[in-house]
Curated annotation (Swiss-Prot):
This protein's record includes keyword rRNA processing: yes
Protein name, per record: Ribosome maturation factor RimM
Pfam families: PRC, RimM
Keywords annotated in UniProt: Chaperone, Cytoplasm, Ribosome biogenesis, rRNA processing
Domain of life: Bacteria
A GO CC term assigned to this protein in UniProt: ribosome
Domain notes per entry: The PRC barrel domain binds ribosomal protein uS19.
Annotated gene: rimM
Spans traversing the lipid bilayer: none
PRC barrel domain span: 90-161
Native organism: Clostridium tetani (strain Massachusetts / E88)
Entries under HAMAP family matching the protein: Ribosome_mat_RimM
Biological process, per Gene Ontology: ribosomal small subunit biogenesis; rRNA processing
Quaternary assembly: Binds ribosomal protein uS19.
Subcellular location as annotated: Cytoplasm
Length: 164
């Protein structure tokens, strides 16, 4: 399991004092208000402030005091240690734990591994790479079981839900 979890991507600077504009990658952006420390490019950083700008988060990080310094962090991820992450309710999973899971159907056929989780308005979609690439909607009618410990996801047979 990943030791660090990505919670946002730094997309730009904000203002002249070194604030960072972050595209959140979490279900609940309010969690950013509680952050005391984060990791950027593997370095621990102290969070001095947080505000929201539409659907983005603006963070003030200790030691990043100007636009020139802030620019160096563009396109880097904001991460937290797993033990500092928000506890998820039952049936919810961190994207980092889903990526790399083997996907099999109920008949035991290996379909591939989850390469990416795509977030859509209605539901997530697993992008599975195997003999064929599959986009699997994360719906209770399709995804039967998610076993993070064994890195395995069981789905209904593709022919039952995908029209070819």
């Amino acid at each position: 399991m990943e030791q660090f979890l990505k919670i946002g991507l730094i997309i730009n600077t904000h203002g002249l004092k070194g604030e960072l504009k972050v595209n959140p990658q979490t279900d609940n952006i309010d969690r950013f208000k509680k952050l005391k420390r984060v990791y950027i490019a593997g370095e621990e950083k102290q969070v001095e402030g947080c505000k929201f700008l539409n659907d983005k988060v603006v963070l003030k990080i200790q030691g990043i005091d100007g636009i020139e310094i802030a620019n160096k962090y563009r396109n880097k991820y904001i991460e937290v240690k797993r033990e500092d992450a928000v506890e998820l309710p039952e049936g919810r999973y961190y994207v980092a734990d889903i990526i790399g899971c083997k996907v099999l159907d109920e008949d035991g056929n290996y379909l591939g591994k989850v390469k990416e989780v795509i977030h859509t308005k209605n539901n997530d979609v697993y992008w599975v790479e195997g003999k064929k690439e599959l986009l699997i909607p994360v719906l209770k009618t399709i995804v039967v079981k998610i076993d993070i410990e064994n890195e395995e996801i069981i789905i209904k047979p593709v022919k039952t839900w995908l029209l070819e």
